[in-house]
Amino acid sequence: ELGRSRKKSEYKKREPELHTALLEVQRRLRLGSSHNVLIIISGVEGAGKGAVVSRLNTWLDTRSIRTVAYWSESDEERERPWMWRFWRNMPPRGEIAIMFGSWYTQPIVDCAYRRIDEDVFAHRLARIAELEHMLSDDGTIIVKFWFHLRREAQQKLLADEQGKKSQASPYTRKF
């Protein structure tokens, strides 16, 4: 989308090598590492986040990964501190957690829809930074991915999805 792409044939040629390298990193992590890995997958609707999460779950050894999708808060989560829903899914040492959605989602959405002002938004981002520093200091390797589409490309994708009446669209989530 943004010009940073590989030809499909080139990717397919390197795919086994990339898969093997990723499994080797996971194996080394699992065998006595003092670290854990948190992979954060966020971005705009339709940008391919789900495909990447599926690929990671296919490629990695699922015995030492946990994938968590964050959508609307549950009643239990609403009655607890804001970060609790994320904190309880942190991976133990030697393991990987994949967060599909993250602690960035709600502040960004709330700011975009003007439900919070800039000061509240800045405060929430500062709290997120504090959490990430704490996790990093404790040995968590945080890998963040933001998936983006130009507005025109996203609108075309969503319009194409609306045209497909025979299947349920994954792009109907409300905030």
Regions found by a protein language model. Give the residues of each.
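Glycine-rich phosphate-binding loop of ATP-dependent small-molecule kinases
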Residues: 1-175
